[in-house]
Design a protein with these regions (language model features):
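Charged, amphipathic alpha-helical segments and their flanking helix caps
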Residues: 1-24, 28-30, 43-128
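A short, hydrophobic beta-strand-centered structural micro-motif
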Residues: 34-44
Length: 128
């Protein structure tokens, strides 16, 4: 499963950036980036093996970030991102997508006043 996490991250970026109305970043936005924007990152992952196949079960965070006083903008942007991501057809070279679904959501305001609204997505792929 060489380079499988890189391929999965690239597939998520391609899916989101191809349809989103805001900038999309992996891990974190660049300093000075203009909100609102979307950020995704791998939270955790495990390798799964059966008798003759291998795959990955991973959890990815997807969130919208806004610098508005209230969370409305972040909620609206996240709803758009969620509609793209939920059951989105990720194309991962050498793998078959088994599942791409949200399991939970979150909302908070950080110490700098930025709103973070998002969800945790379970993505499962297996070698083709």
């Amino acid at each position: 499963m060489a380079n499988d996490y890189t391929a999965l991250g690239s597939a998520i970026y391609s899916l989101l950036s191809g349809a989103a109305t805001v900038s999309i970043y992996n891990q974190r936005a660049p300093q000075g980036g203009t909100p609102p924007y979307g950020i995704f990152n791998r939270q955790s992952a495990i390798d799964e093996r059966t008798f003759n196949t291998a795959g990955i079960s991973s959890d990815y965070v997807l969130k919208a970030v806004s610098n508005r006083v209230w969370p409305g903008e972040a909620k609206e942007v996240y709803q758009g991102l969620h509609s793209i991501m939920q059951d989105g057809a990720l194309s991962v070279s050498g793998f078959v997508l088994l599942r791409n679904q949200r399991g939970s959501t979150f909302e908070y305001q950080d110490a700098d006043g930025f709103w973070h609204v998002g969800g945790l997505y379970r993505i499962e792929i297996e070698e083709s």
